[in-house]
UniProtKB/Swiss-Prot annotation:
Keyword Cytoplasm: yes
Organism in which the protein naturally occurs: Porphyromonas gingivalis (strain ATCC BAA-308 / W83)
InterPro entries reported in the protein's UniProt record: RNase_HII (IPR022898), RNase_HII/HIII (IPR001352), RNase_HII/HIII_dom (IPR024567), RNaseH-like_sf (IPR012337), RNaseH_sf (IPR036397)
Domain (RNase H type-2): residue spans on this chain: 11-201
Annotated protein name in UniProt: Ribonuclease HII
């Protein structure tokens, strides 16, 4: 299915999406993407519907053909301080701030958003499977976050982040129980607190 613009007009439409919200470790990433009105690619879809190879194939296409794109990052420490919902909004704000042009309309994947500088925004549940600018943002956010987890894995291979990317897999939780938490774990997340709590016989 070919994805569309939200409104067929001349406004600079920017799609925003995040990656890593449900993870136990690592930062949350967001991307903001302004695509040309005529942009089209047969593979473009929600990043969760694509293989890893397809996502990395699309990333340079998006980056080279877009009008502008930006990446925003919020650290685990910031997530613990302000909570993951606010951290997701902050990551999107930081991504928008990286754009070379000010957007005229924001498309947000999800049902909530903290308004950014009075730019009109539309929250769309499942927007990454419907609108191409959000789909493109989902691909950039996902691939750049995956890259960051691979880098962190070099210093903390015991957690298996090259496989689980920080998500709460059984192996990841088991590693937290065995080795304790790292500086990159989100200490306020229930999965981390539960896994790090000693078990009693």
């Amino acid at each position: 299915m070919l994805l569309s613009r939200y409104i067929d007009d001349d406004l600079r439409e920017c799609g925003c999406d995040e990656a890593g919200r449900g993870c136990l470790a690592g930062p949350v990433y967001a991307a903001a993407v302004i695509l040309p009105a005529d942009f089209s690619h047969p593979l473009l879809n929600d990043s969760k519907q694509l293989s890893e190879k397809q996502r990395y194939t699309l990333r340079p296409v998006i980056e080279s053909e877009t009008i502008g794109w930006g990446i925003g990052i919020v650290s685990p420490q910031e997530i613990d301080e302000i909570n993951i919902l606010r951290a997701s909004f902050l990551a999107m704000h930081r991504a928008i701030e990286q754009l070379p042009f000010r957007p005229e309309r924001l498309l947000i994947d999800g049902n909530r958003f903290d308004p950014f500088e009075q730019i009109p925004h539309h929250c769309i549940v499942g927007g990454d499977a419907r609108y191409r600018s959000i789909a493109a943002a989902s691909i950039l956010a996902k691939t750049y976050r995956d890259d960051s987890m691979l880098r962190l894995n070099k210093d903390f291979p015991m957690y298996g982040w090259e496989r689980n990317k920080g998500y709460p897999s059984p192996a990841h939780k088991s590693a937290i129980r065995r080795f304790g938490v790292s500086p990159h774990h989100r200490l306020t997340f229930r999965g981390v607190v539960d896994a790090d709590r000693p078990t009693t016989e």
